Amino acid sequence: LDFQEVQESKYRRNAALQIRQEVANVLKHAKLTPETAEAQENTAEEATKEKSDSSKTKDTKKSGQEQKSKFFDKKKGQQNDYRGGFRKDSNPDVVYGRDFEGDTIPLESITGEMGEVMIRCQVEEVEAREIRNEKTILILTVTDFTDSIVIKMFLRNEQVPEVTEHVKKGAFLKFKGVTTIDRFDSELTIGSISGIKKIADFRSMRMDTSPQKRVELHCHTKMSDMDGVTTAKDLVKRAYEWGHKAIAITDHGVVQAFPEANHCFDAWGGCVPKDSDFKVLYGMEAYLVDDLKGIVTNSKGQSMDGKFVVFDIETTGFSPLTCEIIEIGAVRVEKGVITDRFSTFVNPKVPIPYRIEQLTSINDSMVMDAPDIQTILPKFLEFCEGAVMVAHNADFDMSFIIENCKRQGLPQEYTYVDTVGMARFLLPALNRFKLDTVAKAVGVSLDHHHRAVDDAACTAEIFVRFVEMLRERDIFDVDTLNEQGNVSVNTIKKLPTYHAIILARNETGRVNLYKLVSQSHLKYYRRRPRVPKSLFLELREGLLIGSACEAGELYQALLRNAPEPEIARLVNFYDYLEIQPLGNNAFMIADEKNDRVNSNEDLIEINKKIVKLGDQFKKPVVATCDVHFMDPEDEIYRRIIMAGNGFSDADNQAPLYLRTTEEMLEEFSYLGSEKAEEVVITNTNKIADMIEKISPIHPDKFPPVIENSDQDLKDICFNKAHEMYGENLPEIVEERLNRELNSIISNGYAVMYIIAQKLVWKSNEDGYLVGSRGSVGSSLAATMSGITEVNPLPPHYLCPNCKYHDFDSPEVKKFGGMAGCDMPDKICPKCGTKLNKEGFDIPFETFLGFKGDKEPDIDLNFSGEYQANAHRYTEVIFGKGQTFKAGTIGTLAEKTAFGYVKNYYEERGQHKRYCEINRIVKGCTGIRRTTGQHPGGIIVLPVGVEIEKFTPVQHPANDENSDIITTHFDYHSIDGNLLKLDILGHDDPTMIR
C-alpha cells in the first residue's frame, strides 16, 4: 500500500487561528502590555509542558480539556462586560456576533445577490415570530434613506430579549450579513448575520448656527390640500430647535393645522415649553380676488354714447418687455355705431416664433415689408385720439401699447375698458369668457380668431351689444359701470384668484381671520375658497397681509409689465412684500408661455424690482421659503402626491424646503450683504414682533344656556322618582339622586341633560323610541329625566302598583353587581301584583368621573328616518344659527398612499422593494384630501356668541349645493369648549316602531 504522510487539518488550523484572535482580543480588552501578555503566554506554556511530562497516564485527552477549560475561564474573567453566547466580541458596541470593520455600501446599490455585505442603517420596524424548536425569527425593516431592505435573523428564544434591547425601532446599527432572495416572499433580504454594531446617527442634520436668525413667514403643512407633506408639529419643532423666535403656519385657504400647532405647547407631549417666548404665527395663504379693480381703468365719467376705439393686437409672445407687436386691428365706435377701421402689420425686426405662427397664421414674409412700431404707434394713437380704448383682456393689450409708448416718449395714461369684465357682469351664466365663447353667447360671428383685425371687429360688435344691455340697467357712463360691475357674488366667483399671505396679529385678528375663512367657504367658494379684497378691507383690523409668491398679484403684474399706476395700487394694498429663492420660480424658465423669464438673471431682476418697490413705498420686504416640505430629501413625498393627482410636471419639484438663515443669506447674496440681511433677518423678525402670542383655540368652556335648567332638571327627576317609587323615596334612591344632581348642577351640566331630555321626549311624542348608548346609563338622573331606560341602581324588586320595593333581601343581594332583569319573577307580597325587576348596579362615577366634573357624553340612538328631524329640533331649542354639524377632516389613508407610491414607480419602470414602498408611504399619509361631518354630532353655540370665536365654518366637502354647515376644525379640537350632542341614527328604533 502507498501510504501518504499525514497533513495538518485545515479545520484545526482555522480553529487555532480563531482561538489566537480571541485571545488577542481578551488581552487587548484587559489592557495588558505586549511584554506582560508574552510572559503570561510563556508561563502558561511552561506549566502545560511540566504537567504533560509528569503525567504519563492514558487520560491525556481529559487533561487537555481541563487545561483548555481553565484557560477560557481565565480569559472570561479578564473581560468586564463580555457575556459570551450570541456575542462573540468584547467590544461594547457589538450587540451580536463578532466585531467587523470595512466600508459599508448604500442600500440602493443592493440590487441582487451580492454575497457578504456591510450596511449602515436605521431600524424602521422589528417583528419577532416564534417558530418551532424554541427558536424565533427576528424580521427587521431597515433603511439608510437611499433605500430599505429586510434583515432576517434566527435566534434561540432566550436570546431575543437581549438582542431586541439594542436592535429596536429607531436604533442606528451596522450589519454584516449575506444578501439572498427570500424563498417565502421572493424579496431580496439580508440574512446569515455575523455581526451587529451600534453606530451614531449618520444622517446629515441641518442646524441654524447664525448668531442672528431669520423667521419663516410662509409654511404649508399637510392641511394644504394634497400639497404640503409636513406636519405642523414637525415644522414648529424644527424652528424651535433652530433657535428661531417664531414660525408662520399658512396653508392654502384653510386654517385646519392650527390646533395641531397649538398642541406643541401642551404640558404633556409638546415640543415647545409652555412658558417659552417662541410664537406660532397663525395665518393662511388666501386665494385673493381683486374685486376693487374696475372694469374701466382710469375712468373719468365718459358717456357710454361717447367715442370708443375697440382694438386687438397680435404679438411674438406674452411679455411686453421681451416681445414685439406684429399686428394691430382697431374699430372706432361712436354712439353705438362703427364709424372707422384701422388695420396694419408691424415689422417686429425679429423672427416670429413657430408657435405664434401656428396660432395667428402670420409668418415672417407677411411682416417683412411692414412699417416698424416706431412708425405705426403714433398713427394708431392718432386714430384713438379723444376716445376710450376697449379690448378683450385689456390689461394684456394695453401693457404692450404702454411699454412702447414709454420707449418712444409718448403719453402713457389712457382710459380703457375690458370686455372680459363686462362679460362677467352682464353674462353671469357663462363659466368661461374667451372671445369666441362670449361672441357665441351674444350672437356675434368670429371668422378668423387670433387675427387682430378680425378679433377687433368681433370685439366691437360685442361691445355695442353690451352698451345696449347697460342702457337697460340704467348704466350710461363708465363710472357707474365701475361701481356696479364687480359687486355681485357671482362675478367674484369668476374673477381670477391670486395668492396672498394673511397673518393674525392679535385676538381680534384671529376672529377676523376665521370670518374670512368662513365667508370664503360659504359665500365665495368656486373651485377654491375666495377672499374678495372688499371683504378683507371690511375685516382688516388685527390682520397683516403680504404679497406671497409668484402666484401673487404683484409678481404677476411685474411679469406682464403692468403700468406704474397699477403697480403702485397693488403695492399700497399690502403691509409687506415677499421675495423667494430663485429655485422656487425656476420652473418659469422652461415655460414656453412665459416670455418674461428666460434665465436666473430675469428672476433676480424681478426680485430686485420688488425690493426697490419696498424701498420706494416704505414697505418691508421679507425673504420666505414657501415651505412645502421640511428637508430637501422630503421632496419625494410631494412628487408622488402630485403625480398621483395627475400633474405632468410632478418630477420637476422646486426646492420648497425650510432653509436656515445661512442658506437664505446665500440665496440672496446678489442683493449685497446689507440688503440680504435686511430681507432675510431684520424684516422677518420685524413682522414677527408685530404679532402677539395667541391661542387659536379659545381656552374657556362655553356651554349653552337654557333658563331655569337647574330647577327644571331637579323637578323632572324627582317627579319621575316619586312616580316610580312612591311618595317616600327609598334612602338609596334619594341619596343617589341628590348626589348626582348636586354634581351635575355645580359643574354646569344641567343644561346638557335638559337638551337630551327635550330631544328624547320630542321623538317619543312623534312616535319614535330613542335608545341611549355608552355610559349615560350609569346616571340615575338620566334615567329619571327620561334620557335612558337603564336603571343604574343595584338590582331590586319594585311594585308598579303599591310601590313596594326590595333592595336588601338575601335573594336580591345575591344579584349584586349583576342585572336585576335576571332575578326570578316574584309577586308583590302586599298587593299581589307582579313585581318589576330593576337595576344594573352601575356606579355614577362611570359617567362623570370620581369628582363628578367629567364632561358628559350623552349618545342617543334615534330612528334613522327621524334623525334629520332631531337635528332640526336643536335649532328650535337654541335658535337658528346656533347649531352646527361637527366637522371632520379626511386625509390620505395608508392604503391609498400605498397605491400612489406603487403606481409612481411602476409608471417609471423602477423596481422598489416592498419595505421601501412602505417607508415612503409613511411620508405620504395624513395629507388632507377633503372634509366631512360626524354622522350625528351637533355643536351647540351659546346665544350671543359668534362661532368664529372658536372655529370657522364651511359646507362638508365644500359642497356648494349643501345646506349643511360644519365646523372647519375637526370637532375633537373644540369639543372641550363647546357642547357636542351625539344625535345618532340607528335601525332599531325604526324597526320597533
Regions found by a protein language model. Name each.
Residues 1-21:
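A short interface-forming secondary-structure element
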Residues 8-14, 511-512, 947-949:
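Short, conserved charged micro-motifs
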Residues 14-15, 952-976:
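Low-complexity, glycine/alanine/valine/leucine- and proline-rich hydrophobic stretches
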Residues 20-50:
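A short amphipathic beta-strand at an alpha->beta junction
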Residues 21, 44-81:
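Non-catalytic interaction/regulatory segments
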Residues 22, 991-992:
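Short, intrinsically disordered, charge-balanced linker/junction segments flanking boundaries
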Residues 48, 52-61, 89-315, 319-324, ...:
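Phosphodiester-processing cores and adjacent nucleic acid-binding clamps
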Residues 69-94, 108:
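Prokaryote-biased recognition of long, low-complexity C-terminal linker/tail segments
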